């Protein structure tokens, strides 16, 4: 009896091959779809990472889009100098030049126009004189004792440029803007043949209840921590150290049953600010048991260990840690490249293709 297949058997074999092929194609397609969740406490740099994705993986911000950030730049600048002046009263710091008190009064009167996207020569002059004052600088140097935008010095030192009538914010100016994220911001881009959907979720406590429905089918979590927060308290709870809050949040995410099979990538962010701050503000403010030196390398490594030690599944779950500066495009590009390689490897493994 011969081994020739009947027409029916041949059709069944072809069908089987087609099903296998379709399954493989579906597997490869699934391996190319990446859902990234950006988590972390408020002001840890999540939204800046999203802006960097637009700069790196899309065409960046058009001139028209940059113009729309002008009002935000002015608002951030005004709010920064106002925060410093208000703190001077609380910290009992006097102006170096007593006549600056008149400028401060004038600033409060003129602030509204600049908040709406106009920076008159009068407002710019007032801010410039105040920023140069020795008392204002002394208060700025004590900014850990009150809430101040990270980009305060960036904008205030560049007032001549941003106060020009022809001013259009640069990509870097846009990266530095601070607007509290409310709700969920979704970004799509393609990189290394992967289709990314990135979700940026508000970090303040009031925003966290909105995270839960993003959890389904997440490929990886990027958890952002601001290294420079080690000596600060929360804007929404002045009793709580920001780093301790971040650790508490990371513990709940890292060991959550939802994320047993999810890659967790830890971005220890604002390394530039941390490197400056650690020279004058000891790590023992946050970790009283810390016995190392207040050098960037040693203090940063200690913080890394504090977070990685929270992982209760060390045998089966790896935390991929990177030190980042979210406002530095080259640094974010380099780190995201490494992150993508990890995602590709883990994705292929999950789809049985590795």
Swiss-Prot record:
Concerning InterPro entries, the annotation shows: Gprotein_alpha_I, Gprotein_alpha_su, GproteinA_insert, P-loop_NTPase
Which residues of this UniProt protein bind GTP?
A: 43-48, 150-151, 175-178, 200-204, 269-272, 326
Region G2 motif, as annotated, extends over: 173-181
The UniProt record lists lipidation (S-palmitoyl cysteine) at 3
**Known function:** Guanine nucleotide-binding proteins (G proteins) function as transducers downstream of G protein-coupled receptors (GPCRs) in numerous signaling cascades. The alpha chain contains the guanine nucleotide binding site and alternates between an active, GTP-bound state and an inactive, GDP-bound state. Signaling by an activated GPCR promotes GDP release and GTP binding. The alpha subunit has a low GTPase activity that converts bound GTP to GDP, thereby terminating the signal. Both GDP release and GTP hydrolysis are modulated by numerous regulatory proteins.
Q: How does it sit in the membrane?
A: Peripheral membrane protein; Lipid-anchor
Residues that bind Mg(2+) = 47, 181
**GO CC field:** cell cortex; centrosome; cytoplasm; heterotrimeric G-protein complex; midbody; nucleus; plasma membrane
Name of the featured protein: Guanine nucleotide-binding protein G(i) subunit alpha-1
Q: Where is the G-alpha domain?
A: 32-354
- G5 motif: region residues: 324-329
Name the encoding gene, please: GNAI1
Which keywords annotate this record? Cell cycle, Cell division, Cell membrane, Cytoplasm, Cytoskeleton, GTP-binding, Hydrolase, Lipoprotein, Magnesium, Membrane, Metal-binding, Mitosis, Myristate, Nucleotide-binding, Nucleus, Palmitate, Transducer, Transport
Organism of this sequence: Gallus gallus
Annotated region (G3 motif) at 196-205
Top-level taxon of the source organism: Eukaryota
**What is one GO biological process annotated to this record?**
negative regulation of synaptic transmission
Q: Where is the lipid attached (N-myristoyl glycine)?
A: 2
Mainly localized where? nucleus
**Is Cell membrane among this UniProt entry's keywords?**
yes
Q: What class of enzyme is it?
A: hydrolase
